[in-house]
Design a protein with these regions (language model features):
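Intrinsically disordered, low-complexity Ser/Thr/Pro-rich tracts
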Residues: 1-102, 184, 280-285
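Residues that cap or initiate secondary-structure elements
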Residues: 24, 111, 129, 193, ...
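Polar/charged alpha-helical tracts
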Residues: 49-52, 57-59, 78, 92, ...
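N-terminal Sec/ER secretory leader and immediately downstream segment
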Residues: 59-166
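Surface-exposed amphipathic alpha-helical segments
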Residues: 63, 67-68, 222-285
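Low-complexity, polar-biased intrinsically disordered regions enriched in Pro/Ser/Thr/Gly
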Residues: 86-97, 156, 194-202, 228-245
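Signature of long, low-cysteine stretches enriched in small and polar/charged residues
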Residues: 151-215, 221-230
Length: 285
Protein backbone atom coordinates (compact mmCIF):
# COMPACT_ATOMS: atom_id res chain seq x y z
CA UNK A 1 0.00 0.00 0.00
CA UNK A 2 2.94 2.30 0.79
CA UNK A 3 4.30 1.85 -2.77
CA UNK A 4 0.87 2.44 -4.28
CA UNK A 5 0.39 5.70 -2.38
CA UNK A 6 3.89 6.76 -3.37
CA UNK A 7 3.16 6.03 -7.01
CA UNK A 8 -0.09 7.97 -6.91
CA UNK A 9 1.67 10.92 -5.38
CA UNK A 10 4.09 10.97 -8.29
CA UNK A 11 1.47 11.10 -11.01
CA UNK A 12 1.70 14.88 -10.95
CA UNK A 13 5.36 14.76 -11.92
CA UNK A 14 5.86 16.82 -15.03
CA UNK A 15 8.54 14.67 -16.60
CA UNK A 16 7.68 13.94 -20.21
CA UNK A 17 5.91 10.63 -20.41
CA UNK A 18 2.77 8.75 -21.46
CA UNK A 19 1.45 10.30 -24.61
CA UNK A 20 -2.16 10.06 -23.46
CA UNK A 21 -4.40 12.45 -25.29
CA UNK A 22 -6.73 14.56 -23.17
CA UNK A 23 -8.76 15.66 -26.16
CA UNK A 24 -12.40 14.70 -26.46
CA UNK A 25 -12.00 13.99 -30.17
CA UNK A 26 -12.27 10.22 -30.69
CA UNK A 27 -9.70 8.26 -32.65
CA UNK A 28 -10.75 6.67 -35.93
CA UNK A 29 -10.32 2.91 -35.50
CA UNK A 30 -10.33 0.11 -38.07
CA UNK A 31 -10.06 -3.54 -36.98
CA UNK A 32 -8.58 -6.31 -39.09
CA UNK A 33 -7.09 -9.78 -38.81
CA UNK A 34 -3.96 -11.22 -40.33
CA UNK A 35 -5.06 -13.25 -43.32
CA UNK A 36 -1.80 -14.18 -45.02
CA UNK A 37 0.97 -16.40 -43.74
CA UNK A 38 4.23 -15.39 -45.40
CA UNK A 39 7.58 -16.72 -44.13
CA UNK A 40 9.60 -14.26 -42.07
CA UNK A 41 13.31 -14.07 -42.94
CA UNK A 42 15.31 -16.12 -40.45
CA UNK A 43 17.82 -13.32 -39.81
CA UNK A 44 16.93 -9.63 -39.48
CA UNK A 45 19.17 -6.98 -41.05
CA UNK A 46 22.07 -5.90 -38.86
CA UNK A 47 23.42 -2.51 -38.00
CA UNK A 48 26.38 -2.92 -40.35
CA UNK A 49 24.35 -3.99 -43.36
CA UNK A 50 21.94 -1.66 -45.15
CA UNK A 51 18.55 -3.25 -45.57
CA UNK A 52 18.77 -3.49 -49.33
CA UNK A 53 22.15 -5.22 -49.12
CA UNK A 54 21.26 -8.15 -46.86
CA UNK A 55 20.45 -10.49 -49.74
CA UNK A 56 17.37 -11.74 -47.86
CA UNK A 57 14.19 -10.20 -49.29
CA UNK A 58 11.61 -9.10 -46.78
CA UNK A 59 8.17 -10.71 -47.03
CA UNK A 60 5.36 -8.87 -48.71
CA UNK A 61 3.46 -6.63 -46.32
CA UNK A 62 0.11 -7.95 -45.13
CA UNK A 63 -0.90 -5.10 -42.82
CA UNK A 64 -1.64 -1.50 -43.82
CA UNK A 65 -2.77 1.44 -41.70
CA UNK A 66 -2.86 4.87 -43.35
CA UNK A 67 0.72 5.65 -44.48
CA UNK A 68 2.24 2.58 -42.78
CA UNK A 69 2.51 -1.00 -44.06
CA UNK A 70 4.33 -3.97 -42.53
CA UNK A 71 4.45 -7.74 -42.36
CA UNK A 72 2.69 -9.08 -39.26
CA UNK A 73 3.58 -12.69 -38.52
CA UNK A 74 0.41 -14.52 -37.41
CA UNK A 75 2.59 -16.35 -34.88
CA UNK A 76 3.20 -13.00 -33.19
CA UNK A 77 -0.31 -11.51 -33.29
CA UNK A 78 -3.58 -12.60 -34.86
CA UNK A 79 -4.81 -9.17 -35.92
CA UNK A 80 -4.60 -5.43 -35.48
CA UNK A 81 -6.56 -2.23 -34.98
CA UNK A 82 -5.69 0.74 -37.18
CA UNK A 83 -6.44 4.13 -35.73
CA UNK A 84 -5.77 7.78 -36.40
CA UNK A 85 -5.09 9.42 -33.05
CA UNK A 86 -6.22 13.08 -33.02
CA UNK A 87 -3.93 15.94 -32.15
CA UNK A 88 -3.70 17.04 -28.52
CA UNK A 89 -2.05 20.43 -28.55
CA UNK A 90 -3.19 22.33 -25.45
CA UNK A 91 -0.23 24.63 -24.69
CA UNK A 92 -1.12 24.48 -20.99
CA UNK A 93 -0.95 20.68 -20.87
CA UNK A 94 2.14 18.80 -19.67
CA UNK A 95 4.42 17.49 -22.41
CA UNK A 96 3.25 13.92 -22.02
CA UNK A 97 -0.27 15.03 -22.92
CA UNK A 98 0.78 16.75 -26.16
CA UNK A 99 0.97 14.99 -29.51
CA UNK A 100 0.29 15.64 -33.19
CA UNK A 101 -2.28 13.68 -35.16
CA UNK A 102 -0.64 10.31 -35.80
CA UNK A 103 -1.17 6.75 -37.03
CA UNK A 104 -1.22 3.81 -34.65
CA UNK A 105 -1.36 0.06 -35.23
CA UNK A 106 -2.44 -1.79 -32.09
CA UNK A 107 -1.70 -5.52 -32.26
CA UNK A 108 -4.45 -7.89 -31.13
CA UNK A 109 -4.08 -11.53 -30.14
CA UNK A 110 -0.46 -10.79 -29.21
CA UNK A 111 1.68 -13.71 -28.06
CA UNK A 112 1.91 -12.18 -24.55
CA UNK A 113 -1.18 -10.99 -22.68
CA UNK A 114 -1.86 -9.07 -19.47
CA UNK A 115 1.25 -6.91 -19.74
CA UNK A 116 1.59 -3.31 -18.59
CA UNK A 117 1.97 -2.02 -22.15
CA UNK A 118 -0.26 -2.73 -25.12
CA UNK A 119 1.73 -3.74 -28.24
CA UNK A 120 1.59 -0.76 -30.61
CA UNK A 121 3.44 0.73 -33.57
CA UNK A 122 3.10 4.49 -34.10
CA UNK A 123 4.10 6.86 -36.89
CA UNK A 124 4.49 10.51 -35.85
CA UNK A 125 4.86 13.51 -38.19
CA UNK A 126 8.10 15.08 -36.98
CA UNK A 127 7.47 18.62 -38.21
CA UNK A 128 4.17 19.03 -36.37
CA UNK A 129 5.47 17.29 -33.25
CA UNK A 130 8.43 19.70 -33.24
CA UNK A 131 6.06 22.66 -33.53
CA UNK A 132 4.10 21.43 -30.52
CA UNK A 133 7.18 20.57 -28.41
CA UNK A 134 10.06 22.64 -29.85
CA UNK A 135 12.29 22.10 -26.80
CA UNK A 136 11.88 18.33 -26.84
CA UNK A 137 11.42 16.73 -30.25
CA UNK A 138 14.36 18.30 -32.15
CA UNK A 139 16.69 17.21 -29.34
CA UNK A 140 15.40 13.64 -29.48
CA UNK A 141 15.66 13.63 -33.27
CA UNK A 142 19.28 14.79 -33.15
CA UNK A 143 20.09 12.09 -30.58
CA UNK A 144 18.51 9.40 -32.74
CA UNK A 145 20.37 10.60 -35.83
CA UNK A 146 23.66 10.49 -33.93
CA UNK A 147 23.03 6.91 -32.82
CA UNK A 148 22.03 5.64 -36.26
CA UNK A 149 25.21 7.24 -37.60
CA UNK A 150 27.19 5.00 -35.25
CA UNK A 151 27.54 7.28 -32.24
CA UNK A 152 27.92 5.96 -28.67
CA UNK A 153 24.88 5.33 -26.49
CA UNK A 154 26.20 7.10 -23.40
CA UNK A 155 24.60 6.56 -20.00
CA UNK A 156 21.69 9.02 -19.94
CA UNK A 157 19.10 6.89 -21.69
CA UNK A 158 18.10 6.52 -25.33
CA UNK A 159 15.75 8.69 -27.43
CA UNK A 160 12.19 7.48 -27.16
CA UNK A 161 8.66 8.43 -28.18
CA UNK A 162 5.93 8.71 -26.99
CA UNK A 163 6.75 10.97 -24.07
CA UNK A 164 6.17 9.26 -20.73
CA UNK A 165 5.68 10.75 -17.26
CA UNK A 166 8.26 8.28 -15.99
CA UNK A 167 11.96 7.59 -16.35
CA UNK A 168 13.80 5.11 -18.56
CA UNK A 169 15.26 2.75 -15.95
CA UNK A 170 17.75 0.96 -18.18
CA UNK A 171 18.35 -0.37 -21.67
CA UNK A 172 19.72 -3.67 -22.97
CA UNK A 173 20.06 -5.61 -26.25
CA UNK A 174 20.76 -2.33 -28.05
CA UNK A 175 21.35 -2.40 -31.81
CA UNK A 176 21.13 -0.05 -34.76
CA UNK A 177 18.59 -1.63 -37.11
CA UNK A 178 17.34 -0.39 -40.49
CA UNK A 179 13.75 -0.73 -41.62
CA UNK A 180 12.37 -0.66 -45.15
CA UNK A 181 11.85 3.12 -45.15
CA UNK A 182 14.66 4.31 -42.90
CA UNK A 183 16.92 3.55 -39.98
CA UNK A 184 16.62 3.34 -36.22
CA UNK A 185 17.55 1.62 -32.99
CA UNK A 186 16.05 -1.23 -31.01
CA UNK A 187 16.50 -2.01 -27.35
CA UNK A 188 14.80 -3.45 -24.29
CA UNK A 189 13.73 -1.08 -21.56
CA UNK A 190 11.37 -0.39 -18.68
CA UNK A 191 9.89 2.88 -17.44
CA UNK A 192 8.94 3.73 -13.89
CA UNK A 193 8.33 6.65 -11.54
CA UNK A 194 10.36 5.02 -8.78
CA UNK A 195 13.11 2.43 -8.34
CA UNK A 196 11.30 -0.61 -9.71
CA UNK A 197 12.66 -4.15 -10.18
CA UNK A 198 12.94 -5.08 -13.86
CA UNK A 199 10.23 -7.65 -14.47
CA UNK A 200 8.29 -9.50 -17.16
CA UNK A 201 5.11 -7.50 -16.62
CA UNK A 202 6.64 -4.14 -17.51
CA UNK A 203 9.73 -4.72 -19.67
CA UNK A 204 9.31 -4.20 -23.41
CA UNK A 205 11.16 -4.21 -26.72
CA UNK A 206 11.10 -0.86 -28.46
CA UNK A 207 12.07 0.39 -31.88
CA UNK A 208 12.73 4.07 -32.52
CA UNK A 209 13.37 5.01 -36.14
CA UNK A 210 13.09 7.80 -38.65
CA UNK A 211 12.71 8.16 -42.39
CA UNK A 212 15.74 9.58 -44.25
CA UNK A 213 13.93 12.84 -44.99
CA UNK A 214 13.20 13.34 -41.29
CA UNK A 215 9.48 13.54 -42.00
CA UNK A 216 8.33 10.60 -39.87
CA UNK A 217 9.32 9.03 -36.56
CA UNK A 218 8.45 5.34 -36.11
CA UNK A 219 7.95 3.98 -32.59
CA UNK A 220 7.17 0.40 -31.58
CA UNK A 221 6.38 -0.82 -28.06
CA UNK A 222 6.24 -4.62 -27.89
CA UNK A 223 6.14 -6.54 -24.58
CA UNK A 224 8.72 -9.27 -24.07
CA UNK A 225 9.66 -11.70 -21.32
CA UNK A 226 12.71 -13.69 -20.28
CA UNK A 227 13.10 -16.56 -17.78
CA UNK A 228 15.77 -14.51 -16.01
CA UNK A 229 13.19 -11.99 -14.78
CA UNK A 230 10.49 -12.19 -12.10
CA UNK A 231 6.83 -12.14 -13.14
CA UNK A 232 6.28 -8.68 -11.65
CA UNK A 233 7.98 -5.97 -9.61
CA UNK A 234 5.96 -6.27 -6.42
CA UNK A 235 8.94 -7.33 -4.32
CA UNK A 236 12.61 -6.34 -4.36
CA UNK A 237 14.96 -9.12 -5.50
CA UNK A 238 16.80 -11.49 -3.18
CA UNK A 239 14.61 -10.72 -0.18
CA UNK A 240 15.97 -7.19 0.21
CA UNK A 241 14.11 -4.40 1.96
CA UNK A 242 12.91 -1.57 -0.27
CA UNK A 243 15.38 0.79 1.39
CA UNK A 244 18.29 -1.54 0.63
CA UNK A 245 17.10 -2.02 -2.94
CA UNK A 246 16.78 1.73 -3.50
CA UNK A 247 20.25 2.35 -2.10
CA UNK A 248 21.80 -0.24 -4.42
CA UNK A 249 19.64 0.43 -7.46
CA UNK A 250 22.43 1.69 -9.73
CA UNK A 251 24.51 -1.42 -9.09
CA UNK A 252 21.46 -3.65 -9.55
CA UNK A 253 20.55 -2.08 -12.90
CA UNK A 254 24.09 -2.33 -14.28
CA UNK A 255 24.36 -6.00 -13.34
CA UNK A 256 20.92 -6.89 -14.68
CA UNK A 257 21.50 -5.09 -17.99
CA UNK A 258 24.71 -7.09 -18.44
CA UNK A 259 22.84 -10.32 -17.72
CA UNK A 260 20.09 -9.50 -20.22
CA UNK A 261 22.68 -8.59 -22.85
CA UNK A 262 24.23 -12.03 -22.37
CA UNK A 263 20.96 -13.89 -22.96
CA UNK A 264 20.50 -15.58 -26.37
CA UNK A 265 18.09 -13.57 -28.57
CA UNK A 266 15.94 -16.70 -28.92
CA UNK A 267 15.54 -16.95 -25.13
CA UNK A 268 13.14 -14.01 -25.14
CA UNK A 269 9.43 -14.39 -25.82
CA UNK A 270 8.68 -13.34 -28.45
CA UNK A 271 12.19 -13.83 -29.78
CA UNK A 272 14.29 -10.80 -30.62
CA UNK A 273 14.70 -11.99 -34.27
CA UNK A 274 10.90 -12.17 -34.64
CA UNK A 275 10.47 -8.61 -33.38
CA UNK A 276 13.40 -7.38 -35.47
CA UNK A 277 11.76 -8.86 -38.57
CA UNK A 278 8.50 -7.07 -37.76
CA UNK A 279 10.04 -3.61 -37.46
CA UNK A 280 12.41 -4.19 -40.39
CA UNK A 281 9.38 -4.70 -42.64
CA UNK A 282 7.82 -1.30 -41.82
CA UNK A 283 7.21 0.76 -44.94
CA UNK A 284 6.11 4.40 -44.91
CA UNK A 285 4.25 5.51 -48.03
Amino acid sequence: MKRIMYLLSLLSITMFACNISSTATPAVVTTSGVTATIPVPSEPPTASEPLQATGTPLPMTNTTCNEMSLFLDPALASGFNCQTVPEAGDPNAPGFDINPKYTEIKLTGYILSDRFFTPVIDVYPVERFSELLPEVIPTKLAALQALTAGGPTGSKGLPFLPNFNASQEFFAMYQVLPFTSGNGIRFLTQYSQFADPINNHEIFYTYQGQTPDGKYWVSAILPVSNPLLPADGKNPPNGQSWDAFNNNFTTYIAALAAQLNAQPPESYSPTIPMLDALVASITIH
